[in-house]
Every structure is written in C-alpha cells, then in structure tokens.
Curated annotation (Swiss-Prot):
The protein's assembly and partners: Interacts with host CXCR1 and CXCR2.
GO molecular-function terms, A-Z: chemokine activity
GO cellular component: extracellular region
UniProt KW Cell cycle keyword: no
Protein name: Chemokine vCXCL1
Family in the record: Belongs to the intercrine alpha (chemokine CxC) family.
Coiled coil (residue ranges): none
Gene3D superfamilies noted in UniProt: 2.40.50.40
Role: Acts as a functional chemokine, inducing calcium mobilization, chemotaxis, and degranulation of neutrophils. Contributes to the induction of neutrophil chemotaxis by interacting with host CXCR1 and CXCR2 receptors.
Length: 120
C-alpha cells in the first residue's frame, strides 16, 4: 500500500512540475521581442512557422540566421512582417531556406525572396 501511495505522490509531483515548468505548451515569442515589420535583413536564412497550440492562439514566425545545415540564433518575427506574410502564403509548417536580396530595379525598398531549399 505504501508503494502505491508513494508512486502516486511521485507521479503527481512530476505532473505538477511538468505543468509549471514545461515550455512546449507556451508561446515561444513574447510580444515585446519580435523583429519589427519594417526591419528587412538581407542574406541567407531559414524561415519557419509554428501553428498556435493549446496555450498560444496565434501562429509564431521564426527567422534563423545562417543558411547552412546548422541554424544560427533565432529571431521572432512580427505577424505583420513581410517574411511572415510570405510564410502564410505557403500554409504549412516546413522549414524554408531562402536567400533575401534587394531589387533596386523594382523600386526603392523592394526585395526578392528566393527559395533555396526545404526541410520537413
């Protein structure tokens, strides 16, 4: 009987700790720490969108520096950022390796996003 009661207490303690300290059910991007919509970075990046979960109602958008196999540090994007809108057009949660370049012949501030590779 003590063994069953002890196992029950341990499992309840674990579930409480998991609920309080688990981060996968929370939003990864805090509202104040997002790349503003007017900030455009040029270069080779990984873009990724994660659908909202049970505790995060909105989609979250990420830009990872370094276009190689290893991702560099990640940056959260605003939902109104042009890169976030580019990801919304694809409507999936795949990783996109893209090259962002400036296109002065199209006008001031115009950019082109060229798809380099995909990863599930």
């Amino acid at each position: 009987m003590r063994l069953i009661f002890g196992a029950l207490i341990i499992s309840l303690t674990y579930m409480y700790y998991y609920e309080v300290h688990g981060t996968e059910l929370r939003c990864k991007c805090l509202d104040g720490k997002k790349l503003p919509p007017k900030t455009i970075m040029l270069g080779n990046f990984w873009f990724h969108r994660e659908s909202g979960g049970p505790r995060c109602n909105n989609n979250e958008y990420f830009l990872y520096l370094g276009g190689g196999k290893k991702h560099g540090p990640g940056v959260c994007l605003s939902p109104h950022h042009p890169f976030s809108k580019w990801l919304d057009k694809r409507n999936d949660n795949r990783w996109y390796n893209v090259n962002v370049t400036r296109q002065p012949e199209r006008g001031p501030g115009k950019i082109t996003v060229t798809l380099v590779g995909l990863k599930e």
